[in-house]
Structures are given as C-alpha cells and as structure tokens.
C-alpha cells in the first residue's frame, strides 16, 4: 500500500465546495458572491456582474494532475449542496438536484431570479433546482 499524496490542486475561489464524482467529471457546489466564472482571484464588484459565478462547476478530472473546468451552471442562490440523482443515462445526461442558501441574485444579474415579492410564486427563495448536464456539450 502506498502513502496518500496530493496529486494536484486547483485555485478557484467560491466557497462551499461540496463535490461529487461521475465518471471523469467532478461537480462542485459554489455559493459565495465573490466567485468568478473564470476562477479569477480578483473577486467581483457588489453590483450585478456577468463575471460573478454562483452554482455548480464541472471539472474534467480524467488527468488527475491537470483538472480543468469544462462547464458551469449558474443558479439564483448558488449551490450550498447538491446531489447527483441519475446518470449518465443512455442519452448521456447527468441529473443533479441543487439547493442554495444565499440571498437571491438581482434580476439584473440573472433574469429568472425573483426575490421576495409578496404573493409571487416564482420566487427563488425556497426552490430546489433540477440541473441536467448533457455530456455531449461538455468538452473533455
């Protein structure tokens, strides 16, 4: 038996960090508002920004010494935790349930994100996201 060792590390701020592995893909929860889609270290302004990332990141880990981000799915409240519930199926899709606990993004940043409007059933406050990851669109 060998001694466990660190093979590689990826710097990609965003907090939370729950992970799941499906074949050669690593799916990672990202919740904090400072994270960027490009994994940059400079953070994001407090205003609505196309650079901000909150949701799940998808990494190709077929080469463990060089993991690389190959996909990302934005969500209204980020991803505090997720569960892979199916896949890949015969159509080459992975299904992930996602739950975020951060505040709802501004609609300026993500149009379908509706916050606390009394009586509005479309609110993102209490929802669970169902995310479909088609492997044919992931470039690995």
Outline where the language-model segments fall.
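Feature marking well-ordered beta-strand scaffolds used for ligand recognition
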Residues: 1-138
């Amino acid at each position: 038996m060998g001694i466990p060792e660190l093979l590689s590390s990826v710097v990609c701020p965003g907090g939370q960090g729950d992970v799941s592995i499906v074949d050669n893909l690593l799916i990672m929860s990202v919740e904090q508002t400072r994270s960027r889609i490009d994994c940059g270290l400079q953070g994001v302004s407090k205003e609505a920004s196309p650079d901000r990332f909150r949701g799940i990141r998808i990494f190709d880990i077929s080469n463990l010494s060089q993991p690389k981000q190959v996909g990302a799915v934005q969500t209204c409240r980020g991803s505090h935790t997720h569960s892979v519930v199916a896949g890949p199926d015969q159509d080459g899709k992975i299904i992930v349930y996602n739950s975020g606990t951060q505040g709802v993004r501004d609609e300026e940043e993500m149009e379908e994100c509706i916050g606390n409007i009394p009586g509005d059933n479309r609110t993102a406050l209490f929802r669970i996201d169902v995310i479909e990851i088609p492997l044919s669109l992931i470039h690995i």
